[in-house]
Curated annotation (Swiss-Prot):
Gene3D superfamilies to which the protein is assigned, alphabetical: Alpha-1-antitrypsin, domain 1, Antithrombin, subunit I, domain 2
Subcellular location: Cytoplasm
Chief location of this protein within or outside the cell: cytoplasm
Gene that specifies this protein: SERPINB8
Family classification: Belongs to the serpin family. Ov-serpin subfamily.
SMART domains according to UniProt: SERPIN
Identification of the protein by name: Serpin B8
Alphabetized InterPro entries for the sequence: Serpin_CS (IPR023795), Serpin_dom (IPR023796), Serpin_fam (IPR000215), Serpin_sf (IPR036186), Serpin_sf_1 (IPR042178), Serpin_sf_2 (IPR042185)
Length: 374
């Protein structure tokens, strides 16, 4: 599983850099683990150069253990009885005339806890779109709806991969609502008021010298997961950190054993992000080209039909960070009171930062985000 988490981590950072580079004032939020597991399921049916390109894009090198690795990883991360809630909606929707192989369907279920559902895009496109959206909404407890916008599928659609994920967790050290107050958040362009939460407690903290960036680890209850935040110094642009970022550096900067636990004053904005991506252009940039091309796609391990390309890869992700943790909660009145001593180190996220949610046991990056626009 270590090799797999290494592959997923490398893929996570590559995709993160591509998603974020177009406009560095835009927020980014996605789940690399759920995207790579969804694509690995498709990879199971790929052959020839389609498979070679997918393996390169996903940093997976094809051997029999990949799918078993994902099986272990998914059951570890999604297991019941955890103090966090993770709802993943992963499913392939295929045009029913494409004659999908029973073995492939069985393996989707066995390794990825996912189904290939056959629909008739050719006969009733809009009905199929609504059916897919309803299914995702149900799977994510209503937090994620409309994963496919109007017009995103058509009668020629052959294969749609839908991947949505919703996470809810409570902080190990909750922020006290009575200290939350309006505070300015500085972006490159302007200053905006955000609801800034405050907590003084012992947290693991470090400093990445080469990019002049503070590193803070905020654990969730029972410390199975934690949020790791990379906050550049006031005079360092976040773009500098992003440019230098690789998976190797991420591991070095955020290595739990290298961080020191000490009392620190943490200022963190409440945030709520919902991001949707049509991943095709980004996956093409990572070298996955043939899968989307009707003349070249080879998914003969999935269907007896020739030329069944991936028509759409849709990913939608929702996160809310508040005093209790990452979950939706009712708002209460805020008492403005900012009494706090100035002696402890400060970690004040009042300008753009990167954040990652990591699963400790597997060292897997579940989510990657950039908060740069309140």
């Amino acid at each position: 599983m270590d090799d797999l988490c290494e592959a997923n981590g490398t893929f996570a950072i590559s995709l993160f850099k591509i998603l974020g580079e177009e406009d560095n004032s835009r927020n980014v939020f996605f789940s690399p683990m759920s995207i790579s597991s969804a694509l690995a399921m498709v990879f199971m049916g790929a052959k020839g150069s389609t498979a070679a390109q997918m393996s390169q894009a996903l940093c997976l090198y094809k051997d029999g253990d990949i799918h078993r690795g994902f099986q272990s990883l998914l059951s570890e991360v999604n297991r019941t009885g955890t103090q966090y809630l993770l709802r993943t909606a992963n499913r392939l929707f295929g045009e029913k005339t494409c004659d999908f192989l029973p073995d492939f369907k069985e393996y989707c279920q066995k390794f990825y806890q996912a189904e290939l559902e056959e629909l008739s895009f050719a006969e009733d496109t809009e009905e199929c779109r609504k059916h897919i959206n309803d299914w995702v909404a149900e799977k994510t407890e209503g937090k994620i709806s409309e994963v496919l916008d109007a017009g995103t599928v058509d009668p020629l659609t052959k294969l749609v991969l839908v991947n949505a994920i919703y996470f809810k967790g409570k902080w190990n050290e909750q922020f006290d609502r009575k200290y939350t107050r309006g505070m300015l958040f500085k972006t490159n362009e302007e200053k905006k008021t955000v609801q800034m939460m405050f907590k003084e407690a012992k947290f693991k903290m470090g400093y990445a010298d080469e990019v002049h960036t503070q590193v803070l680890e905020l654990p969730y209850v029972e410390e199975e997961l934690s949020m790791v935040i990379l906050l550049p110094d006031d005079n360092t642009d976040l773009a500098v950190v992003e440019k230098a970022l690789t998976y190797e550096k991420f591991k070095a900067w955020t290595n739990s054993e290298k961080l020191t636990k000490s009392k620190v004053q943490v200022f963190l904005p409440r945030l709520k992000l919902e991001e949707s991506y049509d991943l095709e252009p980004f996956l093409r940039r990572l070298g996955m080209i043939d899968a989307f091309d009707e003349a070249k796609a080879d998914f003969s391990g999935m269907s007896t039909e020739k030329n069944v390309p991936l028509s759409k890869v849709a990913h939608k992700c929702f996160v809310e960070v508040n005093e209790e943790g990452t979950e939706a909660a009712a708002a209460t009145a805020v008492v403005r009171n900012s009494r706090c001593s100035r002696m402890e180190p400060r970690f004040c996220a009042d300008h753009p930062f990167l954040f990652f949610i990591r699963h400790h046991k597997t060292n897997c990056i579940l989510f990657c985000g950039r908060f740069s626009s309140p």
